[in-house]
């Protein structure tokens, strides 16, 4: 996915969020915090993942630092997330907005968290990768080993109970 295509996906998400906030004022602060205050998809993703996966052991701010470190080192993860958003938007008839996976779909969240764990695993930070895998499993009921290999443009529909082992590939 080119930078231009990534910008198109992000601009669609922000436009949808503005419309959604106008249509449902009770959720306006939610849309602002999760999407509208962020400059790019990576920032929104890091905010969302950090808040979903935080725990007393690892607060959201610490998780967000790790996610942002990974995105800075490998921006292709953000492009992969945009491809995943497009895949969900194209393949799932129940999804009519680009913002839906980012806001609500735990399969999408689990997949993006896996990408961070996979990066950590490949950096030799295996303890943190396994910790993150466990948080994903507890939070989303999705268990993807950080050593697994997963491509882009992936949709994990509903996602509950999905298990991908360390020697598996999903393309």
Residue ranges and their predicted role:
Residues 168-171:
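Conserved small/polar residues in nucleotide/adenosyl-binding loops
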């Amino acid at each position: 996915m080119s930078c231009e295509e990534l910008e198109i996906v992000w601009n669609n998400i922000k436009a949808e969020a503005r419309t959604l906030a106008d249509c449902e004022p009770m959720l306006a602060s939610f849309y602002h915090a999760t999407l509208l205050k962020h400059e790019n998809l990576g920032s929104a993703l890091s905010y969302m993942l950090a808040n979903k996966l935080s725990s007393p052991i690892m607060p959201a701010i610490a998780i967000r630092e790790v996610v942002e470190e990974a995105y800075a080192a490998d921006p292709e993860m953000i492009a992969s997330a945009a491809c995943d958003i497009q895949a969900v938007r194209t393949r799932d008839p129940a999804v009519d907005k680009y913002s839906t996976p980012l806001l609500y779909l735990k399969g999408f969240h689990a997949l993006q968290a896996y990408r961070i764990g996979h990066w950590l695993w490949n950096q030799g930070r295996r303890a943190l990768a396994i910790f993150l895998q466990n948080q994903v499993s507890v939070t989303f009921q999705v268990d993807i080993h950080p050593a697994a290999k997963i491509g882009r443009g992936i949709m994990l529909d509903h996602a509950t109970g999905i298990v991908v082992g360390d020697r598996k590939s999903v393309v």
